[in-house]
Amino acid sequence: MALRLPASKAAEVAIGSIGCGYDLAIDLRLKYCKGGSKDSRLLDIKEGDDNCEIVLPGGISIPNVSKSIKCDKGERMRFRSDILPFQQMAEQFNQELSLAGKIPSGLFNAMFEFSSCWQKDAAYTKNLAFDGVFISLYSVALDKSQVLLREHVKQAVPSTWDPAALARFIDIYGTHIIVSVKMGGKDVIYAKQQHSSKLQPEDLQKRLKEVADKRFVEASVVHNTGSERVQASSKVETKEQRLRFADTSSLGSYANKEDYVFMCKRRGGNDNRNLMHNEWLQTVQMEPDVISMSFIPITSLLNGVPGSGFLSHAINLYLRYKPPIEELHQFLEFQLPRQWAPVFSELPLGPQRKQQSCASLQFSFFGPKLYVNTTPVDVGKRPITGMRLYLEGRRSNRLAIHLQHLSSLPKIYQLEDDLNRSIRQESHDRRYYEKVNWKNYSHVCTEPVESDDDLSVVTGAQLHVESHGFKNVLFLRLCFSRVVGATLVKNSEWDEAVGFAPKSGLISTLISHHFTAAQKPPPRPADVNINSAIYPGGPPVPTQAPKLLKFVDTSEMTRGPQESPGYWVVSGARLLVEKGKISLKVKYSLFTPILGDEVIEEAYEG
């Protein structure tokens, strides 16, 4: 909800916001300014006897304003954007805010109603556009020669990588500084087309124009605005309906007809949703709101200040992944280098005189043998953030398990050995034994491996093969460590390889999910890859796919900063057999430290 202020008071607040800090991860609202008064400004703006009176359009007079703050009259315009992909539209929004780059701002997310996980939003969004009326009554801006940071802000910059202090700085001062504010109103229709839509860009543009003309030109249809939607169709209906975007982590229904949507939003003016456009226009002068701002990064004014590099890195991480500000401390604690164990340099690349392990699996009479690396993988007292099955060796015929872990232990964590640290999974319950191919050949034990202690996390893993009758059975063993001085934040979650339905046999189905009707999954778009590593997908593999790859799913099961709130750790795992492939399903948990005399009555049920 915006600040509902009369024109004169809104002008005072707008002028008072110049030089204040702002958190760009959130929407543009005057009430979100850090402080929002002269005394809380981050910039040293000259105030004194030479202050002047500013007269704004509409006869509004604001006394005692610094001469460094200038006022300019605005304009009214209708603007229709091009049909643009996600990142280009995000870049266009940033340019309007005097920002560089393609990372979505809070304004962009609010207008198109995206989540903070922009990589997933970008993967499932085909095109974006908007058409609207923008009324700028006036703008107030700071003279560029007066951009000088106050000394107390420089002194507040942490000199080392201190996640708690960095999170506190961002919470108090924000990420950027306001140097310009445009006041007025806007009435805009935003179009969002999902990846599965077959509609061509020119057709989407045409339909958007038709809907916008009905709203702005004819003004003959009463529209609901705010957070309500107008669902698009071939007949350009104005029926309100929420778009359900495909979510890879959900098994919810997917409607192919809901492949694009129009959203009507207003800023400024009367907030009566039943007002027609022409009626709303008459109220903007009396109740203006901020429609745009310009910013400069706080870090651009910290040259030579000790610790400015750490702050810049923390702000970049925060704006890229947008964790909840109240959880930024824990998020930053986890932004350590991640690596796989064993490291690639330890994998044998040359010819081997004999297999390192005699353990092997065979899935049919004529099929090749899949050798199993039974060497334990232990990362010590460091949290694991991901797992994968991998085919090692020159012939890619040796199955191994790899663990992704943080390079060091976050300072907020303490790990101690679990009393039951080595969990040996050798269930004799044959309901968990599932064939990969032929019934009389190798099986996989799909029983979940997890600790009885909710505060335990995985710190080691091992594959193990045992003979049961005439067939070998593959088992997964895990090692656990206990998190000291922490509490479980929410219920643990299970993830599995994308594209595999969670039904690995009757018993596995019963313990994993309730029976549900078969749902048509959405088409899987290409992921937005922001990893600049030389080999972001793992070590080089042969140009020809290994023969045994048809029996093993080598997808990486990881959770990083892009999975909000960004500090998940592995607390369990299980093997699955899906469509004739051995795969992994991983359990993740969130822990937060118990600070001081804090008493946790019960874990949050999320």
Curated annotation (Swiss-Prot):
The keyword Disulfide bond does not apply. Pfam families: MACPF (PF01823). Residues 1-332 form the MACPF domain. InterPro entries: CAD1/NSL1-like, MACPF. The keyword Acyltransferase does not apply. It comes from the Eukaryota. Keywords: Hypersensitive response, Immunity, Innate immunity, Plant defense. GO terms for cellular component: plasma membrane. Coiled coil: none annotated. GO terms for biological process: plant-type hypersensitive response; regulation of salicylic acid mediated signaling pathway. Negatively controls the salicylic acid (SA)-mediated pathway of programmed cell death in plant immunity. Belongs to the complement C6/C7/C8/C9 (TC 1.C.39) family. This is MACPF domain-containing protein At4g24290.
